[in-house]
């Protein structure tokens, strides 16, 4: 995952597409970061924390004010009782939480099962730890996992089952039945479940279901989330892990040698964010849902086939109806032809499995509506 076919360091497709956006003046819908700041209450809390002197190393597990806020959040939204002192760890974003978890809980040769396509860090982290990466396909157009394929993939060799729900890049939200099957298989094969839930508040329709709330799951589930997507603070890199005490202690043992600690003035600010009223959380989902609908409709009008996402930041569109069977090639010409940047889904798929996703493109709708309207207008050039 880290090296190209020539053995050299491989630049990410995200870096390549962002560079194309700059060189062509195209609208960058390739990367999943918002273009608006989060709530003023959070920004002011960060400014105040800096003024108040929270500028040195915070505690290794995170500042108590944030750990308490995370615990209260889990109880408030999901009815989960989480000990802030023994079951909560603050990390440098969800990605560090994932890295510390995978490196702490796997040995070389262990198997880690993920859905595919997958967030690109998954494969890299699994590879760094020497584990074997096993995938279960999410196929177009519905991007739902097949139960029989889950049963075949999860075996006595499986150490971790890593699921991202809501799912990046497809926007799929896994059903309760699918999550219950995963818990059943984890229990049968004595595997741990790692859930990446960074889009937990960005679900359209049915409420988010944390795996840890399901019967029999709590004692074997490591839940990872972050503030960046919920509060438009992706640059602050404040994430967290919640897990049973013995498991969390193992994760902390690795995490302390990654970043050690991070983000002291941002931690109390995110604590403020987690305590915002329900209206804030329902409002951000409703606003993002409108943006999803705006971009999805524009992509359909431009000639793409679109799978409507159920959560998260992204929509997947098929460029085949426009005459492009190779999304990587399409994404390299689209900035010049249409003035918009997307990312090929093949960037989220292992080399040997890319043919099945060859014509699919991911677009981000976590932008200002005026930017999305401009992008939709530009995409009209593809019809001509």
Where do the language-model regions lie?
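N-terminal small-domain helix-loop-helix segment of the aminotransferase-like
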Residues: 2-93, 100, 149, 275-276, ...
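Active-site phosphate-binding strand-loop segment of PLP-dependent enzymes
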Residues: 134, 138-205
């Amino acid at each position: 995952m880290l090296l190209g076919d020539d053995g050299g360091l491989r630049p990410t497709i995200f870096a390549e597409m962002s560079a194309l956006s700059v060189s062509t003046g195209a609208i960058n819908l390739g990367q999943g970061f918002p273009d608006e700041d989060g709530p003023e209450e959070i920004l002011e809390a960060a400014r105040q924390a800096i003024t108040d002197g929270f500028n040195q190393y915070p505690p290794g597990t995170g500042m108590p004010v944030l750990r308490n806020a995370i615990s209260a959040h889990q109880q408030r939204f999901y009815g989960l009782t989480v000990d802030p002192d023994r079951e909560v760890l603050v990390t440098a974003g969800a990605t560090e939480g994932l890295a510390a978890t995978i490196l702490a809980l796997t040995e070389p040769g262990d198997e880690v099962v993920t859905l595919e396509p997958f967030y690109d860090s998954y494969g890299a982290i699994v590879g760094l730890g020497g584990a074997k990466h096993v995938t279960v396909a999410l196929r177009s157009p519905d991007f739902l996992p097949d139960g029989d394929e889950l049963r075949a993939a999860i075996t006595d060799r499986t150490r971790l089952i890593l699921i991202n729900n809501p799912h990046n890049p497809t926007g799929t939200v896994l059903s309760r039945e699918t999550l219950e099957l995963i818990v059943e298989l984890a229990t049968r094969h004595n595997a741990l479940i790692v859930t990446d839930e960074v889009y937990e508040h960005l679900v359209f329709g049915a409420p988010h279901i944390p795996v840890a709330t399901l019967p029999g799951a709590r004692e074997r589930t490591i839940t990872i989330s972050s503030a960046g997507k919920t509060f438009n603070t992706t640059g602050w890199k404040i994430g967290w892990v919640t897990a049973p005490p013995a498991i969390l202690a193992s994760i902390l043992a690795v995490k302390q040698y990654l970043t050690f600690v991070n983000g002291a003035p941002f931690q109390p600010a995110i604590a403020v964010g987690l305590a915002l009223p329900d209206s804030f959380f329902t409002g951000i989902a409703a606003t993002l849902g409108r943006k999803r609908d705006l971009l999805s409709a524009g992509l359909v009008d431009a000639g793409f086939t679109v799978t409507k996402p159920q959560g998260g930041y992204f929509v997947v569109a098929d460029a085949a109806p426009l005459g492009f069977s190779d999304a990587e090639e399409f994404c390299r010409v689209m900035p010049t032809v249409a003035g918009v940047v997307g990312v090929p889904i093949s960037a989220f798929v292992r080399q040997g499995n890319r043919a099945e996703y060859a014509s699919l493109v991911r677009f981000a709708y976590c932008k200002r509506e005026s930017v999305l309207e401009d992008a939709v207008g530009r995409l009209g050039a593809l019809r001509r």
